[in-house]
Amino acid sequence: MTLFKRAIAMTYRINEFEFALPDAELQDSSINILKFPTLDTTLIISRSFLADDETLHSNFDAQLKRLEQQVSNLRYQPVQRVRVGTKYEVEALELRSQFSKAADEVYQFQLALVLPSTRKMLALSYVKAQALGAAEAEHWSRIKLSLTFDGVQ
């Protein structure tokens, strides 16, 4: 008779279903892409982990420098420190930018944050192929202020 040691599984949830992961050692680097047809905008949410020697600011600056190398006509407003969430409980960095990539114009709001007491970084990019107006700014603001963080008080 062979005995199998049963490891504690982690349940991973997405909108459509959840599933058990047999190994709890996991780094979620997934990306979600949500489209809003009425405003013709897209929200991209990406996850990553900061290296031991990185801060939110240093990572954000490095990503901005990489973006400068990959696109043309990059213009952006100064990076702002903001607080987000339903209780304004998480500090984040926000940037409004526009650039050209190939024949496409890209206009975006970007937000980066590190979940408290972790090294997990989340980046949200709210993107449109035309200039962002008041309706898009309001939509973006509502998204930022509605963030509810698991385990953050």
What is each stretch, according to the model?
Residues 2-3, 36-39, 81:
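Acidic (Asp/Glu-rich) sequence patches and key acidic residues
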Residues 9-62:
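Secretory pathway targeting signatures of secreted, lumenal, and periplasmic proteins
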Residues 11, 20-29, 68-84, 149-150:
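Short secondary-structure junctions
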Residues 35-37, 112-118:
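Short glycine/proline-enriched loop/turn "hinge" motifs that connect secondary-structure elements
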Residues 39-44, 91-92, 119-125:
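Glycine-rich, often proline-containing surface loops adjacent to acidic residues and nearby aromatics
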Residues 48-51, 100, 116-118, 126-131:
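Short, flexible beta-strand-to-coil junctions
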Residues 64-115:
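Signature of long, low-cysteine stretches enriched in small and polar/charged residues
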